[in-house]
C-alpha cells in the first residue's frame, strides 16, 4: 500500500482518520490480507477519543484492487492463513453483548465471504485471543489469551477447532501459571507475547518476568526470546539488556495452503447477502434445552451501521 496505484482512499467519503495499514499476511493466491483504518469508523465506547477501528482488507501484491473484506464495527487484528486457505483473525464483537469480553477468533475466505466464528464468540474466558498462528502439520492454532485493557501479552493457549467452537474443551493452556488478564485477575508475575509454534508442544515466544501492564501503563523493557514447551519448560534463547525482543519467527519454507477461488458473484454490491443458518436450535444460548423444536417462529437480523470516526 501507499504506492502510485494506491489513492489512499477512505471508504464512505470521510476523511477523519489517518490511514494506517497493519498486520500483513501473504495469501496463497498472491494477495495480502491486512487490517486498515480506511473504513473510517470506531468502536462506540470510545466517547470521542481518537481511536479509529482497523478492519480486515486485502490487496494484490502489486498494490492493485485494494478493498475491504470485513465489515465489522470495532477493531480486528492479526490475520493469519490457515492450512485450508482460510484467514483466521481477531475480531472485537459487541453487538447486543458485553463491551469488553468478546475479542475472539473469526475466519473468512480470502475474498471476505464465509465469515464465521472460529473459536470463542460465545466464550467469556479469556476476554481476548490475539496473535494467532497455525501450528505446522496440524489443524490446531496457538494464540495469546489476554484482556481488553492490556498490552498484547498474556497466557499462551492452543486451540483445537475440531473439538468445538466455544467454551473450555477446545482450549489448552500451555502456560497455566499466567492467569487470563481481567477475566481471572489483574496482577501476577510474568507474561508472554508473540508466540510462534514449532510443534503442538514446542513454541518460541517473548517472555517478561513483569506483570501484564494494564491500559495506559508502559510495558516493561525486559522481554526476551524463549523456547517454551507444554510441560512447563522455558529456556532462554536470546536477550538484549537494552531493549525488549519480540516476534521470533523461523525462516524456513512451509507448505503453501490451497488457493480458494472467489465465491463472490459478479456485481455483488448490487445483490442481497445470504446468511446461512443450519439449525437455529443448535446454539449456545439455551444450555438447558428449554426451547423445543417448533417454538421459534422468526429470526431477527441486525444490520450493523458503523459509527463514523
Task: Report residues per predicted region.
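Beta-propeller blade signature
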Residues: 1, 48-63, 102-113, 155-166, ...
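Short, conserved, GDST-rich strand-edge loop motifs in beta-rich repeat architectures
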Residues: 1, 10-11, 34-52, 89-103, ...
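Conserved beta-propeller blade repeats
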Residues: 16-31, 73-88, 123-141, 181-198, ...
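Surface-exposed loop and turn segments in beta-propeller and other repeat-based domains
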Residues: 1-15, 67, 115-125, 164-186, ...
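Surface beta-strand/loop "capping" patches
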Residues: 182-183, 190-194, 253-298
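Blade-level signature of beta-propeller repeat domains, shared across WD40, Kelch, NHL, RCC1
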Residues: 220-265
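Asp-box/WD-like beta-propeller blade repeats and closely related beta-sheet repeat scaffolds
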Residues: 1-47, 51-58, 62-77
Amino acid at each position: 500500500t501507499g504506492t502510485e496505484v494506491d489513492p489512499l482512499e477512505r471508504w464512505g467519503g470521510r476523511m477523519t482518520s489517518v490511514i494506517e495499514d497493519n498486520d500483513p499476511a501473504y495469501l496463497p493466491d498472491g494477495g495480502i490480507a491486512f487490517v486498515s483504518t480506511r473504513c473510517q469508523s470506531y468502536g462506540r465506547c470510545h466517547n470521542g477519543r481518537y481511536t479509529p477501528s482497523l478492519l480486515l482488507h486485502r490487496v494484490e501484491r502489486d498494490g492493485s484492487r485494494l478493498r475491504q473484506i470485513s465489515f465489522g464495527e470495532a477493531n480486528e487484528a492479526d490475520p493469519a492463513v490457515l492450512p485450508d486457505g482460510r484467514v483466521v483473525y481477531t475480531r472485537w464483537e459487541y453487538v447486543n453483548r458485553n463491551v469488553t469480553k468478546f475479542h475472539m477468533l473469526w475466519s473468512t475466505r480470502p475474498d471476505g465471504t464465509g465469515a464465521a466464528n472460529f473459536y470463542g464468540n460465545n466464550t467469556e474466558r479469556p476476554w481476548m485471543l490475539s496473535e494467532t498462528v497455525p501450528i505446522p502439520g496440524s489443524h490446531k492454532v496457538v494464540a495469546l489469551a489476554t484482556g481488553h485493557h492490556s498490552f498484547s501479552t498474556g497466557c499462551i493457549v492452543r486451540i483445537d477447532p475440531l473439538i468445538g467452537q466455544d467454551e473450555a474443551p477446545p482450549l489448552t493452556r500451555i502456560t497455566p501459571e499466567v492467569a487470563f488478564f481481567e477475566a481471572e485477575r489483574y496482577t501476577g508475575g510474568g507474561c508472554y507475547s508473540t508466540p510462534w509454534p514449532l510443534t503442538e508442544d514446542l513454541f518460541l515466544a517473548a517472555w517478561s518476568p513483569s506483570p501484564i501492564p494494564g491500559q495506559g501503563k508502559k510495558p516493561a523493557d525486559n522481554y526476551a526470546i524463549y523456547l517454551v514447551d507444554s510441560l512447563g519448560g522455558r529456556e532462554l534463547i536470546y536477550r538484549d539488556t537494552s531493549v525488549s525482543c519480540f516476534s521470533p519467527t523461523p525462516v524456513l519454507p512451509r507448505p503453501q495452503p490451497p488457493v480458494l477461488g472467489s465465491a463472490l458473484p459478479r456485481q455483488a454490491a448490487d445483490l442481497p447477502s445470504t446468511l446461512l443458518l443450519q439449525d437455529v436450535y443448535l446454539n449456545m444460548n439455551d444450555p438447558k434445552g428449554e426451547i423445543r423444536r417448533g417454538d421459534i417462529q422468526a429470526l431477527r437480523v441486525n444490520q450493523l451501521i458503523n459509527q463514523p470516526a
